[in-house]
């Protein structure tokens, strides 16, 4: 931990949030047990990672209760402090959010991962109406909104625990405010409070089961198939090459959202595992796909397109993999999305600094396997994170190509707002690094109802029945996890 003198020196350099860090051994705890001890209240989060579906990432992140958060819907933003609105803004929320983020000047913490605090939460799909370079082409008509969640919700994470899964160490981080005369002492006292919480045992909320319920489609199978045929008409007319319609499913769910996270991380480990407690609703997800990642001046997108079910035996698994890589439709769709990714990254990258890596590799998850590629670029000078978001949002894999025309068609054919689905979840650090996943394989739990949404990439030779089945396959992991909880994880 830095000394009072080091703290004062950093304050003199103009930093207005200064991290105090305490390193402890926590090898007898898991990220889940640490979350239960330190967080497990509204406006907290747990972020984990399993690389390539098979290997746990080195770091997990636990957000302690956030006193400040932003909610944006339409052209209005509310800033909350301890549950009370303390600031409001009317107009495009994105410049305001960027300016809010930029209020905080922090020094980097050596030897820790790139994320050590900042904004954490989501940008819902309807954020598209705030990107001025294409919003004028969208109608933004009033649609049914069964979830009623904010378009954007971001927490200001100034107290967190970073778990090093390799060493068994935990790093407790509390940001001090040097504008407060006793800011250093307050932060030290808060760290001691957190250490006290760590020493206590946590009450494990047992999942003993509840009544079994089935998921019901909001769209319906036949209307969805008709939607696929309508999109194919647009494709044959030359309007577009691909569109990704989606359908939402819902089911009664009265169990713990944290139990759902436990089931999902066991059933479908993915590069982005996340649990957000937003008070009146929870987001529980296991996304395989980056929307965009910024590390200093490098930017990465990772299109995923092409899906097969996992085999029941190693031989069947290999056969499904070979079948996927030899499927002309799936390959054509994936190549199209690589090109779209190159175009998106190219808009914000230096000339000649865009490259495709990991071209068309197979990644395997619990229920499905995908074709995956990497597109990387070196940012042009002066690019902001909102420039990056504007260039890459929404993901081509959740909209189609050309992207704007595909979004117009989605707006026409889908019956309700997408909400969080198809948007982005993740972190935007104080250091300006950003790591956002696409909000897929994601449940929203609100008012004793679980919602999950999934889409299918429609191209010229799509079969409506197959596309319907693809949406079922993609939702299967979340629905299965919910039913595992209903059966009881701890019976």
UniProtKB/Swiss-Prot annotation:
Residues reported in the UniProt entry to bind chorismate: 306-307, 421, 441, 455-457
Annotated SUPFAM superfamilies: ADC synthase
Reported regulation of activity: Feedback inhibited by tryptophan.
Enzyme class: lyase
Substrates-to-products reaction catalysed: chorismate + L-glutamine = anthranilate + pyruvate + L-glutamate + H(+)
Gene Ontology BP term (one): L-tryptophan biosynthetic process
Cofactor: record remark: Binds 1 Mg(2+) ion per subunit.
Residues reported to bind Mg(2+): 333, 470
Molecular-function GO terms, alphabetical: anthranilate synthase activity; metal ion binding
InterPro entries given in the database record: ADC_synthase (IPR005801), Anth_synth_I-like (IPR019999), Anth_synth_I_N (IPR006805), Anth_synth_I_PabB (IPR005256), Chorismate_C (IPR015890)
Pathway in which this enzyme or protein is active: Amino-acid biosynthesis; L-tryptophan biosynthesis; L-tryptophan from chorismate: step 1/5
Superkingdom classification of source: Bacteria
Keywords: Amino-acid biosynthesis, Aromatic amino acid biosynthesis, Lyase, Magnesium, Metal-binding, Tryptophan biosynthesis
EC number per UniProt: 4.1.3.27
Assembly and interaction partners: Heterotetramer consisting of two non-identical subunits: a beta subunit (TrpG) and a large alpha subunit (TrpE).
Protein name per the record: Anthranilate synthase component 1
Organism lineage string: Bacteria, Pseudomonadati, Pseudomonadota, Betaproteobacteria, Neisseriales
């Amino acid at each position: 931990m830095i000394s009072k003198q080091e703290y004062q020196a950093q304050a003199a350099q103009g930093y207005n949030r200064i991290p105090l860090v305490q390193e402890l051994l926590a090898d007898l705890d898991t990220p889940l047990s640490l979350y239960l001890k330190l967080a497990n209240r509204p406006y907290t989060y747990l972020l984990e990672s399993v690389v390539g579906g098979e290997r746990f990432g080195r770091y997990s992140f636990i957000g302690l209760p956030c006193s400040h958060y932003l909610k944006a819907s339409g052209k209005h933003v509310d800033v909350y402090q301890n549950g009370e609105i303390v600031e409001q803004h009317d107009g495009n929320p994105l410049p305001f959010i960027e300016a809010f983020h930029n209020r905080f000047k922090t020094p980097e913490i050596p030897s820790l991962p790139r994320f050590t605090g900042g904004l954490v939460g989501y940008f819902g799909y309807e954020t598209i109406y705030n990107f001025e370079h294409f919003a004028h082409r969208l109608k933004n008509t009033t649609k049914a909104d069964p979830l009623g969640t904010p378009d954007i919700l971001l927490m200001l994470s100034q107290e967190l625990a970073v778990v090093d899964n390799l060493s068994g160490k935990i790093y407790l981080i509390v940001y001090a405010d040097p504008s407060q005369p006793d800011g250093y002492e307050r932060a030290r006292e808060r760290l001691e409070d957190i250490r006290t919480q760590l020493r206590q045992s946590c009450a494990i909320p047992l999942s003993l089961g509840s009544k079994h319920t089935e998921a019901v489609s909001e769209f319906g199978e036949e209307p969805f198939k008709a939607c696929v045929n309508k999109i194919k008409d647009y494709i044959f007319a030359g309007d577009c090459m691909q569109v990704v319609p989606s359908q939402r499913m819902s089911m009664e769910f009265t169990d713990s959202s944290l139990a759902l996270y436990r089931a999902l991380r066991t059933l479908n480990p993915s590069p982005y595992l996340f649990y957000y407690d937003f008070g009146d609703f929870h987001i529980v997800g296991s996304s395989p796909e980056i929307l965009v990642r910024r590390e200093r001046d490098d930017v990465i997108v990772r299109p995923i397109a092409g899906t097969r079910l996992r085999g029941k035996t190693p031989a069947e698994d290999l056969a499904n993999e070979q079948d996927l890589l030899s499927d002309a439709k799936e390959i054509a769709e994936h190549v199209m999305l690589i090109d779209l990714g190159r175009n998106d990254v190219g808009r914000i990258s230096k000339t000649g600094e865009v490259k495709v890596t990991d071209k068309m590799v197979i990644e395997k998850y619990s229920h499905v396997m995908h074709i995956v590629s990497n597109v990387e670029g070196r940012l042009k000078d002066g690019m902001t994170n909102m420039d990056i978001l504007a260039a890459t949002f929404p993901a081509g894999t959740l909209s189609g190509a050309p992207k704007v025309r595909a979004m117009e068609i989605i707006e026409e054919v889908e019956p309700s707002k997408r909400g969080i689905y198809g948007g982005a979840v993740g972190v935007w650090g104080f250091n300006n690094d950003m790591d956002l996943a696409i909000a897929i394989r994601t449940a929203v739990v609100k008012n004793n109802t679980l919602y999950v949404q999934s889409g299918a990439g429609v191209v010229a030779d799509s079969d409506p029945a197959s596309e319907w089945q693809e949406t079922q396959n993609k939702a299967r992991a979340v629905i299965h996890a919910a039913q595992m909880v209903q059966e009881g994880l701890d019976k």
